[in-house]
Regions:
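Short, Lys/Arg-rich, polar N-terminal cytosolic tail immediately upstream
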Residues: 1-9
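Alpha-helical transmembrane segments in multi-pass membrane proteins
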Residues: 9-58, 78
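Hydrophobic alpha-helical transmembrane segments
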Residues: 12-20, 75-80, 108-112, 140-148, ...
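Structural signal for the C-terminal ends of transmembrane alpha-helices
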Residues: 27-31, 53-63, 89-93, 175-178
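Functionally important transmembrane alpha-helices
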Residues: 28-31, 161-204
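Membrane-interface helix termini and inter-helical loops of multi-pass transporters
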Residues: 31-37, 62-68, 94-106
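Membrane-embedded alpha-helical segments of multi-pass membrane proteins
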Residues: 40-52, 108-113, 121, 125, ...
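Function-critical hydrophobic alpha-helical transmembrane segments in multi-pass membrane proteins
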Residues: 48, 89-91, 101-155
Length: 204
């Protein structure tokens, strides 16, 4: 029996919880509709449930998972640099792109509130909960590890955007890592997403 089963396996239960939990939450988001609005679904799935697990199951302070302003001076600097560098790139790639226009035109309604709710939850999920949980075990490699599910969550979006997300996810993770906060990558991501919708739809 020992030959068949092999050596005894040992796992970090928090890593297992975050890995399995985040995978299931992403799948639930894809297959189910909890509320009439997708962004409220994501508040539940990507913010409330992870916070509940951190507080009740892990018995930890959410600050340990980037739920704070962290190094706010550095964060403001990265946010300004991110917005200034990405704005012309987004305008160049998104302006007149028919596939992006077709995809993003329906998202104009409710801006910027809808992207705010959507992305503050996404950023805590990837750049807070997953990143800082993995960083304890995997160190800097956590930056790439959290970028993988982030990139896969973009499948179905315009190709040029989806292909770039593994690198964008790493960059957002690096900002969160340096500032010890998910807030600053959220602000950059919020600007990028809102600006993409406005440019691709022809609103600006």
């Amino acid at each position: 029996m020992k030959y068949l089963l092999g050596e005894k396996l040992s796992f970090d239960w928090k890593i297992v919880t975050v890995t399995v939990g985040s995978t299931l939450l992403l799948m639930v988001d894809h297959y189910y509709k909890i509320t009439p609005f997708k962004y409220w679904d994501r508040v539940i799935l990507y913010l409330i449930i992870p916070l509940f697990i951190i507080l009740i199951l892990f018995r930890e302070n959410p600050k340990e998972y980037g739920f704070s302003f962290g190094d706010w001076k550095l964060g403001l600097t990265y946010t300004a640099l991110g917005i200034l560098s990405m704005a012309p790139i987004i305008y160049f790639l998104g302006s007149g792109n028919t596939s992006m226009q077709k995809y993003y035109e329906p998202y104009l309604h409710g801006l910027p509130w809808t992207t705010f709710l959507d992305l503050i939850c996404w950023e805590f999920f990837f750049r807070g909960w997953i990143l800082f949980a993995y960083s304890r075990k995997f160190g800097h490699n956590a930056l790439w590890l959290q970028a993988v599910p982030f990139a896969l969550a973009h499948v179905g979006k315009p190709e040029i955007e989806t292909l770039s997300t593994i690198f964008g996810g790493f960059a957002f993770g690096w900002v969160a890592w340096r500032t010890k906060s998910f807030v600053w990558p959220f602000l950059i991501h919020w600007f990028i997403a809102t600006f993409i919708i406005l440019v691709a739809s022809g609103a600006i």
